[in-house]
Every structure is written in C-alpha cells, then in structure tokens.
Amino acid sequence: MKELPKVYDPHEVEKKIYQMWLDGNYFHAERDPDKTPFTIVIPPPNVTGQLHLGHAFDETIQDILIRYKRMDGYSTLWLPGYDHAGIATQIKVEEKLRNEGKTRFDLGREGFLDEVWAWKNKFGNRIVEQLKTLGCSCDWERQRFTMDDTCAKAVRETFVNMYEKGLIYKGHRIINWCPHCTTALSDAEVEYVEKPGHLWHVRYPLSDGSGELIIATTRPETMLGDTGVAVNPADECYKDIVGKTCILPLVGREIPIVADEYVEMDFGTGCVKMTPCHDPNDFEVAQRHGLEEILILDNNAKIINGGKYNGMDRYEARKAIVEDLEREGYLVKVEDYSHNVGTCYRCHNDVEPMSSEQWFVKMEPLAKEAIRVVEDGEVKFVPERFTKTYLNWMYNVRDWCISRQLWWGHRIPAWYCKDCGHMTVSREDATECEHCHSRNIEQDPDVLDTWFSSALWPFSTLGWPDKTADLDYFYPTDVLVTGYDIIFFWVARMIFSACEQTHKPPFHTVLIHGLIRDPQGKKMSKSAGNGVDPIEMIDRFGADALRFNIITGNSPGNDTRFYVERCEAMRNFANKLWNASRFVMMNLNVNDCALPERLELPDKWVLSKFNTLAGEVRENLDKYELGIAAQKIYDFIWDTYCDWYIELAKARLNGSDAEAREGAERVLLYVLTGILKLLHPFMPYITEEIYQAIPHECEALIIAPYPKYDEALSFPAEEQSFELVMDAIRAIRSRRADMNVPPSRKAKVIVATAEKDTFVSGAPYIQRLASASEVEVVDAGYEAAPGMVTVTTHSARLLMPMAELIDLEAERARLNKELEKARKQLEAQEKKLANESFVSRAPEAVVNAERERAEKAKALIANLEGSLKELG
C-alpha cells in the first residue's frame, strides 16, 4: 500500500494515469465471443478543430457510458475518428493562402489539395490529444478519418450502389447557394433567421392597357427573372385576366398570367410574381405551366441577364431597382416587414435559392424505412420527445442536394466523355468511357457533401463494405450521443443510409443532449466573447472537475448553463475525497476488502445506504440519467461517507477494542472501494489513483466490476433505526448552534424515547458527535427537571441541563441587551408608520419595506423573550 501525497495534484496524476491505461491496453476492444459487445462511435470532430465545451460535454457522456459498460463486463468499443469537414477546412486553408497573397486557383486543384493535406497533418492530431487530456478511453488503435482509404471505399460503394438503384441522380432543380462559400447547400444546412426588411408594392401593367396588377415582393432585384404572374383559380377578382399578359416593369418583357392553387388568396394582393430560377415554389409552378426560366445571379450573387444592372451585387441592384421603380412610377408603397431569411450554417451569409444542375439523393423511398424503424421502436430517442422532431422532418423531407462546388472532399465518381457525351459512374477510377471506350474523359469537378460520408460513419469505420470481423461483432452499434442541433444533419442521414446499405439500423438508442450555455443562458461562441476553453478549465481545476461539473445537474435533451465557479466546487469535492482516502489509509491495518463478521449499527447503516446507492446509480445509468446518478454519488460521498461515517468510525479507530477497530477499518475500506468504482466513470483520474494506493482486488479500477445491489447488504430496519440517532444528533447540534455553545463545551444529554434499544446502541455516537459529556436513555414519559433545554424529534425528546451549556447570568445579560435594542428599533419603526404624512407621501415600496422591518423586529423580540423564559 503506497502513501498518497498530502495535496492532490491533478496534472501530475492525469498524465501518469492516462499513460498507465495506454500501457495496459485497457481501451482496446477485443472480439470476445463470451462477452456482449457495446459500441459507440464518436461523433467525428472536424479534423482541424479544437476542443470546445460542446465536445467536452458530448465526449464526457460517451466516456461515462463506455467506462460503466467496460466495468460491467461488456466488450466495449469506443471508436474514435475525425471528419474532413469540407467547407470548414477549405475555408481555413484558403484564409491561410489569402494571408500569403495567393488563392486556390493560383495553386490549381492538385496543389491546393496538397496544401489541405499538409494542414490536416499539421493540426489533425490536436483535438485527439485534447480528447486524451479529457480522459476519453477510446480505442485509439481503431482511429478513423472520413477521407481515409477505408471510409473512401465505403463512400464510393454507397454512391454507385444508390446511383444504380436510381436513388442518386443528377438533375436541374432549385438549390440553396452560398455566395460566400461558393457552393450548394442542402436544406438542413440553411438556418432561418428573422430579419427586418421591407415589402415593396409594385405595379405590373396589363399588356392590353385594361388595368394593372399590384404585386408585393420582399426582393425587388429578383424581378429581373420574373417570367409570369400567378393567381388562385378560385379568386373571383382575377378570373377575367387569367390567360392575359402583363408588362414586367423596368424590363418591358411580356409575361403570362396563370392560375395555380399554390397562390394564397388572402396573402398580399392575391397576385404572386413567378421567378422560377430563384424560388423553389415558383420553380414548381413554372414546371406545371411551362414558364420560361431566367437565371439572374451568378455564383457570387452578382446580376447576370439583367441589362444595365449586370455586374451589380444583389443588394446594390436592389437599391438601384427600387430607385428606378419609384422614378418611373411603378412603386406604389413600401411597408416595414420582418421575415425569415435563409443563411448559411457555416458563414452565416444570406443564401440564394438558385436553379442549378446538381447531384441529389431521392429521399422518398429511403424515408419509408427510416420512419418505420423509429415508429416500430427499433431505434429509440432519449428523451422520447425528439422522436416527433425526427419523424416530422422525415415525413416532409425533400431530396438531398449532395454535390458541393469545393475541392476538398470525396470527389463525385462520375466521368464525362468528351467524345460521345456519356456519363460513366464507377467504383474504381474510370480510365475510359464505358459506352464508346474513348479515353477522352473528365471527372465531375464537384465533391460530395461532408455529411454524405458522415452518414456512413457507424459502419464504414468498421470496414464496410468488406465483411470484416469487427463489422460482424460490433455492428450495429448501441448508442449514439449527440446534440439536438444535428438530428437532421446527421442522425436522420445515418439511419436511412444504414438501413439502405446494411439493412439494419445503425444503433438502437439516440441519446440527445442539449447545448452548453453561459450563465445568462446565451449560446457560447468566440464571436460573442462568452466562450470558455475546456483545456483552460482542465489546466486550472483538473479534467475530473470539468467532467463532473458539466454532468451534474444535467438531464437528457436539456440545455445546461456553465459556471466556472462550479469547476472550483468540483475540485473541492475531489480534494474532499482525496483527504478522506488519506485518512482511511493512515488508519488502515488490513490488506484486503473483506467485510468483518460483526457489523455494528453504523456499519449496517452505511452499507445499506451504499447498497441502495449502487442499485439506484445503475438504474440511472441504464436510463441515461447521468446527471442524477452523479449527484447521488456526490451526496453520498460528501455527506454520508465523509461527514457521517468517517466521524462515526473515529471512536472505534481510536478505541482499545481491536475487533471493533478492525471492523471499522474494513467497512471504511469496503465502502471507499465501492464509491471509487461508482464514481470512476465520472471522475476517472482521481479514482484510479486512489484505487492504486489502497488494497485492491483488480489490477486497475478501469476494469474492476461495477457495484451491484446486493440483498445480503440490505439492512432496512437498522438503517431506519440509525436515522433516528442521526436525527437526534442533528437536532442537538442545531440547538447548540442557536445558543452559540462551542463544541468544546460538553453537556449531558438525556434521551426520552420509546425506541430505547436503538438509542442505547446509538448513545456512543450521540456522545461523540453531539458534544455530550454522557448520554442517558430513559422512558418516553420521563418528566424533565426545571432548567433543562428540550429539543424534540419525531422519535425522542432530548434534554440538556441549561447550566452545563452556558453561563446563565452572562447569557441572560446578553439576551436582555439585545431585547432592549430590538424594542427601541420597533418603537422607532411603529412611530414612523403611525405618521400619516410618511405613509401617504412616501413611495409604496419604501412604506412596505418599513412594515417588513417592523415585522422582523417583532419576531426577533418574540424569540428573545422565549429564550429568556427558557433561562428561568
């Protein structure tokens, strides 16, 4: 048994213990046929990212589950890895080049990709090392990357497989375009933000001169692409003009008026301008009515096909067009109008709906199975309320745009023949056209959406499409831990991808957590200046303190507020456990964890309490109630074990009865070992360090069996009996504190009770913990002599001679002095309140405050008078 240092140094311990775990190969998952597998794949962080509090929260939850299952005898695989993060990484590297006075086009595609790989190799390991600092027990030997050969093979197989089934197609549709990132985005990558704007009401003259239409728009610049006006066929106001044409203001183009049920009669004027290339609904109407399509924005959101406005930025063009409309008499009125504007989830610039030829995943056939596995309970969401969120999205899902106009990512495996125009889609890099065998072919320049490869993560990381031993043993995985903000981005796509490619759901449980927010409830971010660096928190307080802080008080699906002060409190908790462990070790003469044959009342009490705790914590962990489990362990260690049982054991440890001493030692060690095991998944470093220092049955705590409820250690009667003794101790302590009696001043305690056997057994503990000179247990009907202080619990009357507690004359003088002061204060307040001028003229809040002070003074006087009466 080694000695623990006087002061706990988390930094020294964490480095040493993590290396011990690595050297022992404890994180490695074996395919053991005699064990049940338990698998979690880590949500892959961006390859060039660094750890933020969201990661720390997400990874701590996963590590707790993995450590719990590992200790519970499962063959646990926590598979780590990182994402190539197409847009994010390309932007980072382009910023670097910009600082060097270069662009990616200066380098060319291959040269730029060399730069990105160099960037990845330089910064890619940073977040891995930070995850290790946090204590993550991942199987680092199985680490994956979404662009490695294994994942790339899975991406190719999936793309070609789905293309051959008609589930992936290339088509001309309205997509979301980010002019800043210069790429298409999927619907899930668009964040809608309410922004103040205007509603411009514009005259569209009828071509035959018989009148005009008034049309309202929030985007006058898109008028340049108008190719029609639509009204509702049931709208009586416009039935006579359907089939006519009107003149497009400023442009002079004649455009048809069509009837379509898409138009809402009660919105605006009931007339809607049709811009098929820049609105998804207009596009659908145009398809039904054969309207012309005119694209008026280029990839940088500058005007094209717009006459004199060509080359203008979209917002510059808006201003110019509004001025021209007003000057030429087309502008009727302008109203303030707030509306939702689509923005890029990555750069937060406004996105443009644009007609474009892109690659899409046909979602309707895939959604059916993805809906079924959730509705049938094969995949469960925790909390259950997120099932509705998922299903609502899946029932209304649109085809997924998967092509991105980037260079970094999985390039689309399609080659175009320059001779015959045929497109070849292939699992291997094509060298010739499959139709005419010409070698004059060129690969599609676009790459796949990052989320396409991420959607395959649960099975591509295990070797799919090859039939590997890992895939056979560890798949499907068990739990996916993620935030509610990426249910659409990632969770839904993993489910339908897995169902399609492996014919199995990728996991059985989706554990949804909330976001980490600042103390005011605001979302944390660098730009807002309220972000907290988890590595800085680890440097200040230790990884265990950070982990325990972000877990305690948290519940699945709910946001949590982060307070730095709580990290300090959790460090203090670690210190309390450390000091308690040192105390046990300094008093330990046994070298095994066996319980004594004879258990005294406090022993049965603490063992029964611990036994209940073990059962409850298991139940909480199995229900993913990690915050509740952590709080229960905290309360038991701080209150039950440290503040009560250690103090109760001191009498036997310092006594002359060798058997009683050994019994206390064994129970202290047994419970300490148990709480180290219960706490280990939450605070792995300090628990492993202490475990290695005390007598232990396993080579490492990380693989020690997790405590279970044991019927043999359930002592409900003794537990209840000892709670009566504890109630008495608390009551005596409270009364002594009220009377300002120092602990050093002893006084006899008489216990009048019907539970005589219980209190006779508990008398030594009352004497030690309630500063009693002696304890006498008498019948419940005992009549107290004059001059006794009486405290009552629901099972006993506790009597103490007043004279033994305090100097009666000095206390009487002190109380009289305070009473005189309180009466003078009350007299002044009542005089003030009797002044009609004060009551009628002073602000109501001031008068109420004065009345409140008067009531408090009355209560104080009553208490002081009661105390004086007790003194006699």
What are these regions (language model features)?
Residues R67-S75, K96-R109, E129, T133-C138, ...:
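Secondary-structure transition/capping motifs at alpha-helix termini
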Residues K2, V7, K16, M20-G24, ...:
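Residue patterns forming the tRNA-binding/recognition surfaces of aminoacyl-tRNA synthetases
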Residues E30-V93, T146, V155, I215-T217, ...:
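N-terminal catalytic cores of NTP/NDP-binding nucleotidyl/phosphoryl-transfer enzymes
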Residues R253-V258, P445-Y475, D639, D643-I646:
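Active-site-adjacent "gating/activation" loops or surface patches in catalytic cores
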Residues A56-I64, L213-P249, V272-D279, H289-L295, ...:
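Extended active-site and interfacial segments that coordinate phosphate-rich ligands
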Residues H201, N392-F452, L456, E500-A543, ...:
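Feature 926 captures the class I aminoacyl-tRNA synthetase adenylation module centered on the KMSKS loop
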